[in-house]
Curated annotation (Swiss-Prot):
Protein name: Anhydro-N-acetylmuramic acid kinase
Function: Catalyzes the specific phosphorylation of 1,6-anhydro-N-acetylmuramic acid (anhMurNAc) with the simultaneous cleavage of the 1,6-anhydro ring, generating MurNAc-6-P. Is required for the utilization of anhMurNAc either imported from the medium or derived from its own cell wall murein, and thus plays a role in cell wall recycling.
Classification via Gene3D superfamilies: 3.30.420.40
NCBIfam families hit by this protein: PRK09585.1-3, PRK09585.1-4
Record gene name: anmK
Keyword Cytoplasm listed: no
Catalytic activity: 1,6-anhydro-N-acetyl-beta-muramate + ATP + H2O = N-acetyl-D-muramate 6-phosphate + ADP + H(+)
Top-level division of the source organism's lineage: Bacteria
């Protein structure tokens, strides 16, 4: 980071991921030469009506523009509620905050066609919070020929790199992604050309969808549904027979590909399987697709640190550890809490950091990760 930059100060970060269950927020102070200091955090859930609208926007249909605009307004209201809760908890006012970095809600991600769409009414959010809002982080990377994802590797390198060992940070959100952090013997540097990362495949997107269908619950709490089942190796092979898994990095994906329709098409020849066996197999799919990418790109990895909602699923973490060992990797699996950052904080903290980088007019992407033509300042400002 730059020395003594005037961008230092208090920032908010908001992230609502592909699970679409709510928004995670964080209040953090960034000061040059010091680790980020978390001042408060909050989670604000989405009502079923908003969640249904967001799911619907991921499918082609009539009147999408109207539905998107209304959903963006509803998101801004929930985001603002999260900000107000965090400010109260931290004892701060809007005037104390330099900026709010907000990811928005991804409803389309098609970088191969030159666009990615995260909905959010950032102007309304600035009005409701009276805080400078920095949003639309992915578009500039896509405009520069990149995937627009993942964007967190630069932050991961800053926070989690080691001078002594190669580490992998694995985000198990709706989609899984990895950041490969080679031993940084010259010190941590988010611009290190050796940092790599990409999306691996589905994680909670399919696991949650199957739990909702068969348990009427939004997720498989503690992985207990999967634990009741047995992995069907034939189905697992069919699920892994997807061109995306063979695609070379840089690459990114989302619910555009890995959704309930994709799963149903794969299940067409497996009608007799018990629901819990399918859930066990979906859990194994996530573990296998992540382990395959780590074995392919980070064979010298010595530790894997997990963040995202999947970090709360011990069955999934055990499956990942088993899959890594089966591929000859001696890499224990832990959550980022072992490195001092609770796993539920990592992504919202990353978007607060990206807002900080924007104010410093410093790059937020790693072009070697996304495939962009170069490093770019990411985001757009909506003044308070």
């Amino acid at each position: 980071m730059q020395t003594g930059h005037p961008a230092d100060g208090v920032y908010l970060g908001l992230m609502s991921g592909t699970s679409m269950d709510g928004v995670d927020g964080i209040t953090v102070r960034f000061e040059t030469g010091k680790p980020p200091a978390v001042l408060s955090e909050a989670f604000v859930g989405f009502a079923d009506t908003l969640r249904d609208s967001l799911f619907a926007l991921q499918q082609p249909g009539d009147d999408e523009i109207e539905r998107e605009a209304l959903a963006a307004n509803a998101l801004a209201a929930r985001y603002a509620a999260c900000c107000h809760e965090m400010l109260r908890a931290a004892g701060l006012s809007p005037d104390d905050v330099r900026a709010l970095g907000v990811h928005g809600q991804t409803v389309r991600h098609r970088p191969e066609r030159g666009y990615t769409r995260q909905i959010n009414n950032a102007a309304l959010l600035a009005e409701l919070t009276r805080i400078d809002v920095i949003a639309d982080f992915r578009s500039r990377d896509v405009a520069a020929g990149g995937q627009g994802a993942p964007l967190v590797p630069a932050f991961h390198a800053t926070m989690f790199g080691s001078p002594d060992e190669t580490r992998v940070v694995c985000n198990l959100g709706g989609i899984s992604n990895i950041t490969i952090l080679p031993a940084a013997r010259d010190g941590r540097d988010e611009r290190n050309d050796a940092v790599r990362g990409h999306d691996c495949g589905p994680a909670n997107a399919l696991i949650d969808a199957w739990a909702l269908r068969h348990l009427k619950r939004p997720f498989d709490e503690g992985g207990r549904f999967a634990a009741r089942g047995t992995v069907d190796e034939t189905l697992l092979a069919a699920l892994l027979d997807e061109p995306y898994f063979r695609q070379s990095a840089p690459k990114s994906t989302g619910r555009d590909l890995f959704n309930a329709d994709w799963l149903d098409a794969k299940l067409a020849g497996f009608r007799g399987l018990a629901p819990e066996d399918v859930q066990a197999t979906l859990t194994a799919l996530t573990a296998a697709s992540v382990a395959d990418e780590i074995a392919r790109h980070a064979h010298d990895c010595r530790a894997v640190y997990v963040c995202g909602g999947g970090a709360r699923n011990p069955v999934l973490l055990d499956a990942l550890a088993t899959a890594l060992a089966a591929r000859g990797l001696d890499a224990p699996v832990a959550t980022t809490a072992a490195l001092g950052v609770p796993p539920q904080q990592v992504e919202s903290l990353a978007f607060a950091w990206l807002a900080y980088r924007f104010n410093a007019r410093a790059p937020g992407n790693v072009s070697a990760v996304t495939g962009a033509a170069g490093e770019r300042v990411l985001g757009a400002l909506y003044p308070r």
